[in-house]
A protein has these predicted regions:
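Bacterial N-terminal signal peptides
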Residues: 4-15
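Signal peptide processing junction and immediate N-terminal pro/mature segment
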Residues: 16-22
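Short, glycine-/small- and polar/acidic-enriched structural segments
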Residues: 22-173, 177-183, 196-200, 205-206
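Pocket-lining segment of extracytoplasmic ligand-binding domains
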Residues: 86-87, 165-255
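Secondary-structure end/capping motifs
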Residues: 220-300
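Conserved C-terminal helix/tail region of periplasmic/extracytoplasmic solute-binding proteins
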Residues: 293-326
């Protein structure tokens, strides 16, 4: 796929690919879907050498939409993906044989940022709102917020911008009245004088964010590789929670943010909320299914069909996480 090789070129340009001197191990390509703090577990595991310690030589690439991510996963271009939102569930409902095996963040790590003249959520009626993509976390969060305050989708104009930085730019230019952003872009927007109308993490929405997704085929044919990947991933999560200096340095590299105050704020907000064991939750997946109202099977599908936490449960039973956090 042409776009796949373009993504590889972008990663090389950003300096986020594996170096030629990386230790030998089983080669594996993994992808992440957004430039936000919730995606950092994967970066941390890579930069800390956690995957190498478990015999894996992991290359990371960036694929900016859930749809393309699933295409790459099903097509075999990547073996493992870290993606936010309901895209993996929608793909499975349509026949893609993929499953969630871990979730690094089980709530919406987003904020509705608006122009200063927006004083209440009801003021969003009739306004232009920025999201990343239809079907994304930003899309779901916006529609959830509007529905909760009796504002119909047709009463606002949704504009897609791709990444949080582009939504922020649209706010600055006045193209939109509000937009859903993720950290650290949220912190930058607040510093520029824009208003944080809603912090979704305070709303208490349980929703799968930063899911680790694989194909059924990979899970069945390469269970040991999947296990070793999750062990390295869990070590990345441990570094997130326990090593602020390293985490902020890695975030700065991948997010291309140099402002130390913004990195400090981002880390202090997210590190305490990251789980020790990245289990998916039934309630989160159930709500994600409810967000897929246009999918005929979503109403009757069972959350258990969409994830397999066997590896995590086995690791916990064997004492892996207890040893990690001793």
């Amino acid at each position: 796929m042409k776009w796949f090789f373009v993504c590889l070129a972008v990663v090389h340009a950003l300096g986020c690919h594996a170096s030629a001197s990386a230790q030998s191990g089983q080669k594996l390509v993994a992808a992440y879907s957004s430039l936000s703090a919730t995606q950092a577990t994967l970066w941390l595991a890579k930069e800390a050498g956690a995957f190498q310690r478990h015999g894996l030589d992991v290359d990371l690439i960036y694929i900016s939409t859930g749809t393309k991510m699933v295409q790459a996963l099903v097509g075999g271009d990547i073996k493992i993906s870290q993606v936010g939102g309901a895209a993996p569930l929608a793909a499975r409902l349509r026949g893609a044989e993929i499953k969630i095996i871990a979730v690094a963040f089980n709530t919406l790590a987003l904020s509705m940022i608006t122009q200063t003249d927006i004083r209440a959520i009801t003021d969003l009626k009739g306004k232009r709102l920025g999201i990343s993509r239809f079907g994304s976390n930003t899309d779901f969060g916006t529609r959830y917020l509007l529905k909760k305050h009796n504002i119909a989708d047709r009463d606002v104009t949704f504009l897609q911008f791709g990444e949080a930085q582009a939504i922020f730019a649209a706010l600055q230019s006045g193209t939109i009245h509000g937009g859903v952003l993720s950290y650290p872009t949220t912190a930058l927007a607040i510093r520029k004088g824009f208003k944080e109308l809603v912090d979704f993490s305070d709303v208490g929405i349980e929703f799968p964010n930063s899911e680790v997704v694989v194909t059924d085929r990979f899970l069945q044919s390469q269970p040991d590789m999947a296990r070793r990947f999750l062990m390295g991933y869990a070590e990345g999560l441990h570094r997130y929670k326990t090593d602020g200096a390293f985490t902020k340095r890695v975030m700065g590299k991948y997010l291309r943010v140099q402002d130390q105050a913004v990195l400090d704020e981002t880390y202090n907000l997210f590190a305490p909320k990251m789980p020790r064991i990245p289990y998916p939750t039934l309630n989160g997946i159930r709500l994600a299914l409810e967000s897929l109202a246009d999918e005929p099977r979503a109403k009757t599908a069972k959350p258990e069909e969409f994830y397999d936490d066997t590896i995590l449960r086995n690791l916990e039973r064997e004492g892996f996480f207890r040893q990690l956090y001793r």
